């Protein structure tokens, strides 16, 4: 709790994560131990118990350890303990069972967008989902877009804030995590057409919702409040469910993050310069962008080899 108290100026998502870890510790016998009594083997045994007995996933345990390791490091720095019991490699103790969110193929993307466009009910979400697939925006960046952020003359999207809704149902505007998150994302003519339709069909509420000084959000829900990530996650979930009831060849799970990952993967496969792609994606670290280049399949490798051979 002292560690959390000293962490000022952190994002509300981070604070929520800290509270979750504190609540978990309060319920556990491990959490009642004195810090100078916690051994390396105790820390490992507890994390194994979280996975094998409590059924927690790797990513959840990774987040818990991500709070406890720096908290114990603070105790080391304060000379309260000699060594950090959480200073070990997590994957050496807990099985990584997390499912990576793969990009979908170009054919799957085409099939899904065609299905959405032609569906009587879901066609209303076509423009928004098309934009997600063809800009690579984070869903919180997309939800935060206002009419003023779409610069049609320059054919670009201004990205300098994110919209999120807290667990207390409060709407908040946040700045991107890093400077790299502030950028202009170029638009194709098709993306610009989607934005034009969205703005033309946008509801006109009696009172424009305002969040931290921002107004003119592109998508509003039935309560005339800006749509948030959860809305789009649910729309995509229901779309894929309906698609899979109709077609024999099943569509994998598609989330807004899968749309972003698919865009990134498609750009990498098309031979886009990694530094250019890093800028468009808003990645602070080039290694995150380069990881996408590792998602190539044999067909991609074969096509690339033939292309170079012909050059």
What are these regions (language model features)?
Residues 168-173, 270, 291, 295-311:
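DNA/chromatin major-groove-contacting recognition/catalytic segments
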Residues 20-24, 45, 66, 70, ...:
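Generic recognition of well-ordered alpha-helical segments
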Residues 51, 76, 132-133, 268:
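Alpha-helix C-terminal capping/helix-coil junction sites
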Residues 114-125, 135, 185, 201-210, ...:
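Short, basic (Lys/Arg/His-rich) helix/loop patches that form interaction surfaces
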Residues 149-156, 272-292:
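Short, polar N-cap/turn motifs at the start of nucleic acid-interacting alpha helices
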Residues 62-66, 77, 81-145, 153, ...:
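Basic, Lys/Arg- and aromatic-enriched nucleic-acid-binding interface segment
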Residues 2-80, 98, 120-123, 225-231, ...:
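N-terminal core-binding DNA-recognition domain of tyrosine site-specific recombinases/integrases
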Residues 90-91, 145-203, 210:
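Conserved tyrosine-mediated DNA breakage-rejoining catalytic core shared by Y-recombinases
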């Amino acid at each position: 709790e002292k560690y959390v108290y000293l962490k000022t100026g952190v994002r509300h998502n981070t604070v929520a994560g800290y509270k979750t870890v504190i609540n978990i510790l309060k319920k556990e016998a491990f959490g009642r131990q004195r810090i100078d009594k916690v051994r390396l083997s105790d820390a490992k045994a507890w994390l194994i118990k979280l996975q094998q007995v409590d059924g927690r996933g790797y990513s959840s345990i990774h987040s818990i350890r991500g709070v406890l390791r720096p908290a114990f490091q603070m105790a080391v720095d304060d000379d309260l303990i000699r060594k950090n019991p959480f200073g070990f490699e997590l994957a050496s103790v807990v099985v990584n069972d997390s499912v990576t969110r793969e990009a979908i193929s170009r054919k799957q993307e085409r099939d899904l967008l065609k299905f959405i466009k032609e569906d009587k009910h879901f066609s209303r979400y076509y423009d928004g989902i098309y934009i997600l697939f063809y800009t690579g925006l984070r869903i919180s960046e997309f939800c935060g877009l206002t009419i003023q952020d779409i610069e049609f003359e320059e054919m670009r999207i201004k990205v300098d804030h994110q919209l999120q809704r807290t667990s207390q149902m409060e709407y908040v505007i946040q700045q991107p995590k890093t400077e790299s998150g502030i950028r202009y994302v170029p638009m194709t003519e098709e993306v610009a057409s989607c934005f034009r339709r969205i703005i033309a069909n946008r509801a006109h509420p009696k009172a424009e919702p305002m969040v931290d000084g921002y107004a003119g959000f592109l998508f509003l829900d039935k309560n005339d409040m800006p749509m948030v990530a959860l809305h789009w996650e649910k729309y995509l979930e229901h779309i894929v469910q309906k698609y899979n009831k109709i077609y024999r060849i099943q569509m994998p799970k598609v989330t807004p993050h899968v749309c972003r990952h698919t865009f990134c993967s498609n750009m990498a496969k098309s031979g886009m310069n990694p530094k250019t792609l890093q800028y468009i994606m808003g990645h602070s670290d080039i290694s995150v962008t380069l990881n996408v280049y590792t998602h190539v399949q044999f067909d991609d490798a074969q096509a690339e080899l033939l292309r170079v051979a012909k050059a």
